[in-house]
Amino acid sequence: GTNSLSGNELDYYGGFTGAVPLLEDYLSYDGGILYYDYPGMTDQNTADGARNVDFVEYYGSLSLNVPTPVTDIGISYYYGFSPSGFQQDNYDYQNVGIEFAVPNTPFTLSGAAGFTGSEMVDGNSYTDYIATISTSAFGLDWALSYTTVSGYLADQDIDQITWSVGASF
């Protein structure tokens, strides 16, 4: 089968975030709903013909801040679930990450590993990894990241180095 690609992805989301009472300095949470919209895109790989590939994801995460004598270390766990999605019936995504400031520098190092398990066509799943160094300067957020994937489609050249500049307001 083939896909009709629109070339666009629009994401809509809503949720809540907060800190666990009495542990505000150490433990926080986040939860919500994401809607992935692919205007004009349909999946031609289904037995009954084309269907819309837009999907909803429900997510929750916990973050732990561990103070040490040198620097604080942040550890996070994320879980997302979608009852339907791009060429699949169900999928879940789990991610564990760590982040810490490099002592006596303006830099932060972070890394994460995520696992996608799904009932996709051919039952494929994969693990993704990311390592990032970031800083803030001149009113902007700067980051250099390396991303790789193992498992599904791992034989393709999907290692990436990404340089990003952003602003928050």
List each model region and its residues.
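Glycine- and aromatic-enriched membrane insertion/assembly motifs of diderm outer-membrane
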Residues: 1-31, 35, 167-169
